[in-house]
């Protein structure tokens, strides 16, 4: 599997020093461990987010879908964002990885045959026999760790 491109080669504190960037390897490892993410795109009504199952394939993110809003919105190679995360509210820890790139429907028969056998299989009902491929332009991530002595709300 080819690695996805990332913004940072190693973890570095950001100016606020409460946030750090995940390394290239950390981002790829976390993406490979999960199978549910959020595809963000723009349709005629504006930005929309879809929870989707996904697989990694040759350095890209692949999402199975049915004809409809996702395919309509990515026609012509739309720019999209794809986010995967994990959060433990009890410990106030977690992480988030964001992939930014171009999305297009997969149409090549050889690619479709290979992708059809990739897990995970969609949780949502429907055939989900169409595929959207996201070719990353950048991948970035950050750990989430909130000090235990801070309140859950930022305004209080």
Predicted features along the sequence, with ranges:
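Extreme N-terminal tail/first-helix region
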Residues: 1-32, 153
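N-terminal short leaders/motifs
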Residues: 1-13, 51-56, 84-89
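Short beta-strand segments
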Residues: 34-66, 82
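Short, surface-exposed beta-strand-loop junctions and turns on beta-sheet-rich folds
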Residues: 45, 69-71, 148
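A short, sequence-level motif marking secondary-structure junctions
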Residues: 53-56, 102, 148
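General beta-strand recognition
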Residues: 60-62, 133, 140
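Short, structured beta-strand-loop surface elements
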Residues: 67-130, 136-138
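Short, charged, intrinsically disordered terminal tails
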Residues: 143-156
């Amino acid at each position: 599997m080819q690695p996805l491109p990332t913004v940072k080669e190693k973890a570095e504190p950001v100016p606020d020093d409460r946030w750090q960037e995940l390394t290239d390897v950390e981002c790829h490892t976390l993406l490979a461990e999960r199978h549910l993410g959020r595809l963000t795109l723009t349709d005629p009504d504006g930005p929309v987010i879809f929870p989707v199952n996904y697989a990694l394939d040759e350095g890209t993110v692949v999402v199975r879908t049915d004809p409809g809003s996702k395919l309509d919105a990515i026609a012509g190679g739309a720019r999209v964002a794809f986010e995967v995360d994990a959060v433990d509210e009890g410990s106030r820890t977690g992480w988030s990885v964001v992939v930014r790139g171009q999305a297009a429907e997969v149409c090549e028969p050889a690619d479709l045959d290979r992708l059809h056998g990739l897990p995970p299989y969609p949780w949502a009902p429907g055939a989900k026999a169409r595929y959207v491929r996201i070719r990353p332009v950048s991948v970035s991530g950050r750990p989430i760790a909130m000090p235990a002595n801070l309140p859950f709300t930022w305004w209080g």
